[in-house]
From Swiss-Prot:
Location within or outside the cell: Nucleus
Gene (UniProt): VQ19
Modification Phosphothreonine, positions: 155, 196, 211
Organism: Arabidopsis thaliana
A GO term from the CC aspect: nucleus
Keywords from the UniProt entry: Nucleus, Phosphoprotein
Motif mapping: VQ: 47-56
Protein name (database record): VQ motif-containing protein 19
């Protein structure tokens, strides 16, 4: 088996190296071209050893020896950054001031509502029932419920011309009769006003002429 390599050279001579049974022999061969060729003779059993000697490997590597770790190209100098520990957030002074201001507003609102309730009940700052120490405690005795009660307005019932037409609780009123008619029959007919007296016979209007125009006395 032969392996030939052609390294570039400017000289016209070439160096031929041959390895036979582990010994290296050099032969100088003059050639007309400028590319010397290295010929290597080896059998199939020693071919691997010869290739390792030519490539620079000092000793063949055993199959059980661990392989060196391979690093991908461009990532050999990659360093894992340290994990940043989460630090507790510090509340700014503005947010703390806002919470304090809102808390003071709520307390002032609560105190003002309490004082107003006591004043409505009939007791002010000079009342014996008013005590600055017991502002947080409100008992029913401190409040005057009759004075706090609001009178609901009374809505008058709408009445008709007869005085009892608009009372829905009166069984004889037209409203109750209308409701009963709708509940029984599903409809209710209102009576139409009559302009003429009921005793007189209604007047009939002729729809067609009674006499013929040919029999008129003018002709």
């Amino acid at each position: 088996m032969e392996i030939s390599t052609n390294p570039p050279s400017s000289s016209s001579s070439s160096v031929s190296s041959s390895i036979i049974n582990g010994s290296l022999h050099h032969h100088i061969i003059t050639r007309s071209d400028h590319y010397p060729t290295t010929f290597v003779q080896a059998d199939s059993s020693s071919f691997k050893q010869v290739v390792q000697m030519l490539t620079g490997s000092s000793s063949p590597r055993s199959p059980d020896s661990p392989r060196p770790p391979t690093t991908p190209s461009g990532k050999g100098n990659f360093v894992i950054p340290p994990i940043k520990t989460a630090q507790p957030k510090k509340h700014s002074g503005n947010k703390l001031y806002e919470r304090r201001s809102h808390g003071g507003f709520n307390n002032n609102l609560k105190n003002s509502l309490m004082i107003n309730t006591l004043m409505i009940g009939g007791g002010g700052a000079g009342s014996p029932r008013f005590s600055p120490r017991n502002q947080e405690i409100l008992s029913p005795s401190c409040l005057d419920f009759p004075k706090l009660a609001l009178n609901s307005p009374v809505t008058p019932l709408k009445q008709g011309t007869n005085g009892n037409e608009g009372d829905p609780f009166d069984k004889m009123s037209p409203l109750s009769e209308e409701e009963r008619g709708i509940a029984d029959k599903g409809y209710y007919l209102h009576r139409s006003p009559i302009s003429t007296p009921r005793d007189s016979e209604p007047q009939l209007l002729p729809l067609f002429p009674v006499t013929s125009p040919r029999l008129s006395p003018e002709m």
